[in-house]
Amino acid sequence: MDIYSIIKKPVFTEKALNLKESQNKVVIEVHPDVNKVQVKKAFEEIFKVKVDSVSIINVKPKIKRVGLHFTKTKKTKKAIVTLKAGEKLDLIEGV
């Protein structure tokens, strides 16, 4: 799998921004078929930072109502990437 298709987008929630400020962790949405090792290699190669650890969260689909019908959202996968001490990622600093 191509490293640019592994990482989809960063997650900008209040909890994710608090993790970034307090514990030097970045939350990103990743492809559903990847594992921790692939996420770590892709993140280090794309953003040129050292990664300490990666945690993976599988997000279950939620039931949403559309008019009279009920549908499900797609299942997704999030990764919490812990950067090594002294490393900074300037991509999310301005948010």
Swiss-Prot record:
Gene Ontology terms, MF aspect: rRNA binding; structural constituent of ribosome
GO biological process, one term: translation
Domain of life: Bacteria
Keywords carried by this UniProt record: Ribonucleoprotein, Ribosomal protein, RNA-binding, rRNA-binding
Kinase recorded as keyword: no
Any Pfam family: Ribosomal_L23
Gene Ontology terms: cellular component: cytosolic large ribosomal subunit
Keyword Cytoplasm in record: no
Family indicated by similarity: Belongs to the universal ribosomal protein uL23 family.
Protein's job: One of the early assembly proteins it binds 23S rRNA. One of the proteins that surrounds the polypeptide exit tunnel on the outside of the ribosome. Forms the main docking site for trigger factor binding to the ribosome.
HAMAP family: Ribosomal_uL23_B
PANTHER family per UniProt: 60S RIBOSOMAL PROTEIN L23A (PTHR11620)
Subunit field text: Part of the 50S ribosomal subunit. Contacts protein L29, and trigger factor when it is bound to the ribosome.
Name by which UniProt lists this protein: Large ribosomal subunit protein uL23
Lineage of origin: Bacteria, Pseudomonadati, Nitrospirota, Thermodesulfovibrionia, Thermodesulfovibrionales
